[in-house]
């Protein structure tokens, strides 16, 4: 019996097959550039080998789901003899709104509530819903489990999640901070507890999930206490293509200046801003560092703006945790690999006893390795931990659907 895990992005579809009885990963893959002229399909086998090919553009997520099942059935690894071997499907869903405080087994009522939440995540939830409905048609008798990035942050208190807007906006329209990257933060919190040999209930962390999308999470007593992303993933840190925090008046101002509607301006803030917007070169940090080596000013400025924002958030989260922090933890593609970003983000904190070991930090560039990168005398541990959202989804699946099914 097999478990299929699906992670839909706005233009991508990640998937993995696990053996139900022992949680062993059998195969994984990703379909990228959905809705574009050429799509990319990558298959990652258990031996680490990768096969990659280009195909004529896959037009939408339902077609991508159909393609995924064909790939799994036709794989040289013979993982599946029959599609009916898949009995459970776990979905990563970005936004659960106010409805979902935990992962749930799919029911019609849950799907209706998820559709209602889509207005809060128009860039992310529609693709997840399309995947869920397509799987429902192909495997109608399989159990589907919905795992939400927002659920982890349901422990944030009202004074931290409310915006200072009319209270009726919250009561009538659920306008509030929700936060994201929750599956990642849940995993990293558990791993930090194991590494530090400290019970989760007594654990205070500042976790930075730094990738093309980026956020920061204050964890108090093992639970989410505050986070930088808001009602959507646009708020907070400077990201690959997202602006992060801005004065909201800019939206109407630039709408008038550029003669664009507010939806178009929001699209620019989501897809043409951040590192890409400032550098006018790339949203890929590898490209940015290359441009900096060439002496390119705007790329250097983009990194300065990004790491300055990160440093501000770290400082404020140290304060709200009452200066009682067990570890600062970096995760995500940039957080685990980019030692220069870590160094810039933590520069100056040695004055309050948070000391980065520069040599250890420089050595920690492997996306698959956990590292402790603080000095021996640092009052706060500094860690780099690769995230594993699939592990959190698997754990939630087994909690909802026991192994003696």
UniProtKB/Swiss-Prot annotation:
GO terms for molecular function: acetate kinase activity; ATP binding; magnesium ion binding. Keywords: ATP-binding, Cytoplasm, Kinase, Magnesium, Metal-binding, Nucleotide-binding, Transferase. This is Acetate kinase. Homodimer. Signal peptide: none annotated. It is found in: Cytoplasm. Substrate binds at residue 92. It catalyses: acetate + ATP = acetyl phosphate + ADP. It comes from Borrelia garinii subsp. bavariensis (strain ATCC BAA-2496 / DSM 23469 / PBi) (Borreliella bavariensis). GO terms for biological process: acetate metabolic process; acetyl-CoA biosynthetic process. Pathway: Metabolic intermediate biosynthesis; acetyl-CoA biosynthesis; acetyl-CoA from acetate: step 1/2. The gene is ackA. Belongs to the acetokinase family. CDD domains: ASKHA_NBD_AcK_PK (cd24010). The lineage of its organism: Bacteria, Pseudomonadati, Spirochaetota, Spirochaetia, Spirochaetales. InterPro entries: Ac/propionate_kinase (IPR004372), Aliphatic_acid_kin_short-chain (IPR000890), Aliphatic_acid_kinase_CS (IPR023865), ATPase_NBD (IPR043129). Mg(2+) binds at residues 7, 389. Catalyzes the formation of acetyl phosphate from acetate and ATP. Can also catalyze the reverse reaction. Its cofactor is Mg(2+); Mn(2+). It is an enzyme of class 2 (transferase). The keyword ATP-binding applies. ATP binds at residues 14, 209-213, 284-286. PANTHER family: ACETATE KINASE, ACETATE KINASE-RELATED. Mg(2+). Can also accept Mn(2+).
